[in-house]
Curated annotation (Swiss-Prot):
GO cellular component, one term: cytosol
Assembly and interaction partners: Homodimer. Within each dimer, one monomer is responsible for RNA recognition and catalysis, while the other monomer binds to the replacement base PreQ1.
Cofactor(s) needed by this chain: Zn(2+)
Enzyme class: transferase
Keywords: Glycosyltransferase, Metal-binding, Queuosine biosynthesis, Transferase, tRNA processing, Zinc
UniProt remark on cofactor binding: Binds 1 zinc ion per subunit.
Binding, substrate: D92, S93, G94, G95, F96, D146, Q190, G217
Region (RNA binding) residue spans: 248-254
The family this protein is said to belong to: Belongs to the queuine tRNA-ribosyltransferase family.
Protein name, per record: Queuine tRNA-ribosyltransferase
Amino acid sequence: MLTFDIINQSLESRARTGRITTAHGVIETPIFMPVGTLGTVKAVSVEELKACQAQIILGNTYHLYLRPGCEVMAHMGGLHPFMNWDRPILTDSGGFQFFSLAKLAKFKDEGVSFQSHIDGSRHLFTPERAVEIQSILGSDIMMSLDWCMGYPATRKEAMGALEKTTQWAERGRNFWIEQGRVNNLFGIVQGGMFADLRSISARQLADLDFPGYAIGGLSVGEPTELMYEMADHTVPQLPLEKPKYVMGVGTPENLVELAGMGVDMFDCVMPSRNARNGQLFTSTGTMNISNAAFRLDESPLDAECSCYTCQNYSRAYLRHLYKSRELLAYRLNTIHNLHYYLDLMHQMRNAINQGRFMAFKQEFYRKRER
């Protein structure tokens, strides 16, 4: 079973540092989890992930279930040996994919029936099946099946998704207990953009006593301030001693703000996806490497960055690679963006431990105003 120890609590905010201990190692929080949808973080190897100081990565249950499938995963001993990753893995339940591929999915009391986007075959995810598949994957942290509601949504729609999510959470938890509490299962708070519904969801899930909790249904098209409002409202409703995870978020600014609200875990495709689109994150903000201003620029992407890319290559060379659509561009850009995100979390942890989180936050924004 997972253990979570709170190391330091900021006196200036709800920010805190912690330590999650799993069967595959320790995770220092707050932490960002690179997304490896299909058992790979696109464009980089596990060795490069480790060099970027990745402590835990995320796998996608929906996609891995469809390809390569449970038979292959079971035969190979799970996702860890399959991809040669010996550190913790978190897997989602498929709920967000059913939301994003809504035309292919139907929500029922039993679970979610859906059509494969690969070959059109029909499948059913029940709360029990979602836990079973994640157990086959060997996830250190599994997510309960949830109903993610988009934005905007009516109160009636949000309430329906909340009720279904709670019912599924209880069923998934019961199955997890029957199977011997293999690995760890988190519940997911829903409730749309209605604070009172999120309070209800949080209380219901807290009563089920999961090892940790995710706050879902954010970053689904709502304004940033509304996302912050919902997160700020929800975090205190959940057990203080349990890790809290905001799913699918987000920008560097999002991470700083939400960590200040007491969020411990984050994931997002942004650093890797944006790297492939030429958008790079630096201590002074974002840059588009295709910009003509970098054609003769001999400087690194970020003078403050110690990543492999910044230590070895110029902006001019990286621009050339990207404009030429050379595959190396995607690798070097992704290494930099992941290093930036993970180093940002490292800096945050240090600041919280040293009692200067607010000073860190002010400096973070000051650099972006240059």
